[in-house]
């Protein structure tokens, strides 16, 4: 009998639910290294065994926040297990999301190029 595969839509739904639940759970974590953290996105492997969790932080050092989140990953996994109604709750792997920083840098470079072009004209 062929193995039943989950639909890509279900993968997205579960990733979104994990993102919402983690956002709530992080407010309850008492580690001072975790300041104002925003979960930007969650990417799941097809077998739901692993989840890449991308975050940004408004306060504090991103590296310290990453260490604190990695330290809290086991607790967060257990809390997700209580909330989610799926057979396998993924192992959480946190990654600092540099997308916003890159966008700001690109915007700065564009502004700089436009200013140089205006000076030349």
Curated annotation (Swiss-Prot):
Keywords linked to the UniProt accession: Cytoplasm, Ribosome biogenesis
UniProt keyword annotation of Transmembrane present: no
Gene Ontology cellular component annotations, sorted alphabetically? cytosol
Keyword Cell cycle attached: no
Q: Where in the cell is it found?
A: Cytoplasm
SUPFAM superfamilies noted in UniProt: Ribosome-binding factor A, RbfA (SSF89919)
GO-annotated biological processes:
maturation of SSU-rRNA
Q: Name one GO molecular function term.
A: ribosomal small subunit binding
Q: Which family does it belong to?
A: Belongs to the RbfA family.
PANTHER family named among the record's database cross-references: RIBOSOME-BINDING FACTOR A, CHLOROPLASTIC-RELATED (PTHR33515:SF1)
Subunit structure and binding partners: Monomer. Binds 30S ribosomal subunits, but not 50S ribosomal subunits or 70S ribosomes.
Function noted in UniProt: One of several proteins that assist in the late maturation steps of the functional core of the 30S ribosomal subunit. Associates with free 30S ribosomal subunits (but not with 30S subunits that are part of 70S ribosomes or polysomes). Required for efficient processing of 16S rRNA. May interact with the 5'-terminal helix region of 16S rRNA.
Q: What is this protein called?
A: Ribosome-binding factor A
User: What is the protein's species of origin?
Assistant: Paraburkholderia xenovorans (strain LB400)
Gene it is expressed from: rbfA
